[in-house]
Amino acid sequence: MKKLLAIVCLFVLYVGVTAARADELVDMAQKMYPNEKINPINRPKSSLIVDANTGNILWQDNIDEVRDPASMSKLMTLYLVFEAIQQGKLSENTVIKATPRDEAIAKIYEISNNKIVAGVDYTVSELITMTAVPSSNATTVMLANYLSNNDPDTFLDMMNAKAKELGMTNTKWFNASGAAAVSFKGLYTPQRYDNNAANQTTARDLAILGYHFVKNYPNILGNYIPVYTRHNI
C-alpha cells in the first residue's frame, strides 16, 4: 500500500468548486468510510493528496486558491520547533515556565485553548501535544516566544522565511497560530505585521509544508498526532 499524506483543506469560504470534482471527492470519502454518513455540504473547498515518499500530487482540486488556513497555521510553528530540536537549540524535555500573560491568553475562550497556569513548568513535548491536539493558541504562542526570545515579529519573520525556503510561494503569515493577532485582546501584538490580517496560503503550499514535515521530522506522526491507516486505496 502506498503511504499517503493527505492535506485536505476544509476552508468554508465563498469561493466555489466544480461540482463534478467535489462530488467525486465525497464519493471517495464515502467508499473509504462506508459506515459513516458523508454529508456533501461538508465537502472541502480545496483538497490535495500527495505521495508522502515523493511529494507527487495524486489528487487535486482548487489547490492554488489563496485561503485562510486558520489553525493549520500551527503546522509551521511546530515545524520550526522540530527544526530547532534537530539543531540542538532545545529538546522535547526543555522546560518552559508559563507567564501570567500565557495564562491570560489561555483564558480567551473565543479562540481554541486549553488550561495554562502561570508559574507552572511545561515541557516542550507537552506544549507540542497541546498545540497539535486541542489546537491551543496559548501553547503555540509559548513555543513561538521561546524560539524568538519573546519577539513576535522575529518569529513571524522566521515563519515567512521558512515558507519561502520550502517553496510555499503563495503563503504569508501574520500570526503564529491561525487566530488573528487582534483576537488576543492585546496580549499578542506584532508591530510590523497587520494585527487584523488572517494568514494566507493554499492547499498546494500546505501540502509542501506537510510533505517536508513528515519527511524531515517523521516522529510528529504517532508520537503527537494519531496515524490512521486505510488499506486497498
Where do the language-model regions lie?
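N-terminal signal peptide c-region/cleavage motif recognized by signal peptidases
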Residues: 17-19
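Domain-terminus/edge residues, biased toward the C-terminal soluble/receptor-binding domains
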Residues: 1, 191-233
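Sec-dependent signal peptide recognition
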Residues: 2-8
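Bacterial N-terminal signal peptides
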Residues: 8-15
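Residues that line or immediately flank small-molecule/substrate-binding pockets and catalytic motifs
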Residues: 8, 135, 227
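Generic cytosolic/nucleocytoplasmic N-terminal low-complexity/intrinsically disordered segments
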Residues: 1-2, 88
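Active-site-adjacent loops and short helices of periplasmic peptidoglycan-processing enzymes
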Residues: 22-203, 214
